[in-house]
Regions:
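Short amphipathic alpha-helical segments
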Residues: 47-50, 132, 428, 432
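Gly/Ser/Thr/Ala-enriched C-terminal appendages of enzymes
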Residues: 1-25, 39-40, 278, 283, ...
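Short coil/turn segments at secondary-structure boundaries
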Residues: 66-67, 135-139, 153, 448-455
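N-terminal, Lys/Arg-enriched amphipathic/low-complexity engagement segments
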Residues: 27-83
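Buried, small/hydrophobic-residue-enriched core segments of structured protein domains
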Residues: 1-28, 35-37, 73, 79-91, ...
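Short, positively charged
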Residues: 71-79, 159, 388-397
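Structural motif
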Residues: 148-151, 190-193, 220-223, 255-256, ...
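Residue-level "edge-of-site" marker
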Residues: 197, 288, 312
């Protein structure tokens, strides 16, 4: 992984701090975001496997150093320092697949000022991108809870890495497979596919294209039915081929057509009627063509009979929100050998940050398993132990949640993922997918609806609110 995957100002700041002898002072940074993507009610965390690879392999080779030297803005001693640079700090993060909300720390970074500056850009790039894709995928899964969802976006992805890691993120978000062969190999994702119009057009007759495909790929009987005319040619030809297979006793358990154009609601209903009348009521109708959660929800409301969806462009590009606004902010700095809590001040209250080394606790209703809320507190505070507990929202202190003893459970969300520069084991992808599904089950429906969802209020502990108030008063000279 190239050490140049960073912004220039990160390097120039590190260069200047090196010259002042302040480059190895200890710091703690938090990564969080301020607004849910897609005007939704939540975000799904993804990207930790990629993050670990990035951190482990972040270094500067000889060519990198030569290039930086050619810019004539870096001290020679600093460039020598970069030659042996390796991250040796600690990172805590919320597990992949976790449902999260604005304002709470999703990643806590312990390192030196140089480490934080050099790694910030890459860490943010990875987590912002993959969490965005996972969230978009989960929204699609929400409107099609029982259908097959296939990620078809590679050719529309904004680069190779976006296509590769986006496919993995889509799986965390609830998809069943991908057309991306490399993602299948690297991540063990089921690879799926049917045929393209070019296959059908390679034959003089559509039915000959179907017959030849069936002859060579007998177990993959999803025939593309819209090359010419879905209802007058595609479906009748598919029925004829299925009849031939049935007579030969070779009709597989799964068979059907894909529709990639036209009015999918109308065409799917007519195709289902035609298949049923011909004795093939179990024929699968697969749909594709610029689909997203809104289109699929609308098609279903119109009686669409598609049960298998190929979603490409709008999943891999996270259509609707161009980027997740995740930020990476200092919360603690070293001064005179001590850890000093710090915060960002701003005229915009929403951009003020929370100071200190923090962690996040999540509360669930004991009887239903549904989420109650999250609590951000200082890391050395004692967690709720199951007794009576009061939660107070910082922005609305009159709205208090009184939790009675024995009615709730609690878990800490931030877990160690890198320790002293070494990666710690992460769950494998199938485990992450199951965990992500369970996470969604903890959300009340009002947080998952596509339009105007309710927004989870994050609570700050009394101790954290007091620390924040003290720093604000100090800044104001009170």
């Amino acid at each position: 992984m190239n050490g140049l995957i960073t912004d220039l100002y990160q390097l120039t700041m590190a260069n200047a701090l090196f010259n002042k002898g302040r480059h190895e002072r200890k710091v703690v940074f938090d990564r969080f975001y301020r607004k849910n993507p897609f005007n939704g009610g939540y975000t799904i965390v993804a990207g930790l496997e990629h993050l670990q690879q990035f951190v482990e392999n972040f270094r500067f080779d000889e060519e990198d150093i030569d290039y930086l030297e050619s810019l004539h803005i870096f001290y020679p001693a600093f460039l020598d320092y970069l030659k042996d640079f390796r991250f040796k700090g600690n990172i805590y993060a919320v597990p992949e697949g976790t449902v999260v909300f604005p304002g709470e720390p999703l990643l806590r970074f312990h390192g030196t000022t140089t480490e934080a500056m050099l790694l910030e850009t890459g860490l943010s790039m990875i987590m912002n991108h993959e969490s965005l894709i996972a969230t978009k995928a989960r929204r699609v899964r929400t409107v099609a809870p029982k259908d097959a969802l296939m990620e078809f976006g590679l050719r529309r992805a904004q680069g190779h890495s976006a296509g590769l890691w986006g496919a993995r993120a889509a799986m965390i978000g609830g998809f069943n497979g991908t057309s991306n062969v490399e993602a299948g190999k690297q991540f063990g994702i089921p690879v799926l596919g049917t045929m393209a119009h070019s296959w059908v057009m390679s034959f003089d007759e559509e039915i000959d294209a179907f017959r030849e495909y069936v002859r060579q790929y007998h177990d993959n009987l999803i025939l593309l039915a819209d090359t010419y005319n879905v209802l007058e040619m595609g479906v009748p030809h598919a029925i004829q081929v299925f009849k031939e297979l049935k007579e030969e006793g070779r009709l597989p358990g799964k068979y059907g057509i894909r529709i990639d154009s036209g009015d999918i609601a109308y065409l799917s209903q007519e195709a289902t009627r035609m298949f049923t009348e011909a004795g093939f009521p179990d024929a699968i109708i697969s749909g594709s063509n610029d689909l997203d959660e809104y289109t699929i929800q609308s098609l279903k409301a119109q009686g669409c009979t598609v049960t298998s969806w190929g979603v490409g462009t709008k999943i891999i590009t996270a259509d609707g929100t161009s980027a997740l606004g995740g930020v990476f902010k200092m919360a603690v700095k070293e001064a005179d050998g001590k850890e000093v809590p710090v915060m960002k001040f701003s005229n915009d209250v929403e951009k003020m940050t929370n100071p200190g080394i923090k962690t996040v606790y999540r509360f669930y209703k004991k009887d239903t398993g549904k989420m109650i809320t999250d609590l951000v507190c200082l890391h050395d505070e004692k967690a709720a132990d199951g007794g009576d507990f009061t939660l107070v929202t910082e922005s609305a202190k009159w709205r208090r949640k009184e939790l009675k003893a024995g009615t709730y459970t609690v878990e800490e969300l931030l877990r160690p993922v890198v320790e002293n520069g070494r990666n710690l084991p992460l769950p494998v992808l199938p485990e992450i997918i199951r965990y992500a599904d369970k996470q969604m089950d903890t959300l009340w429906p009002e947080y998952t609806r596509l339009l105007n969802p309710d927004l989870m209020e994050i609570n700050l502990s009394d101790k954290l609110q007091t620390l924040k108030s003290e720093l604000i008063r100090r800044e104001l000279g009170e």
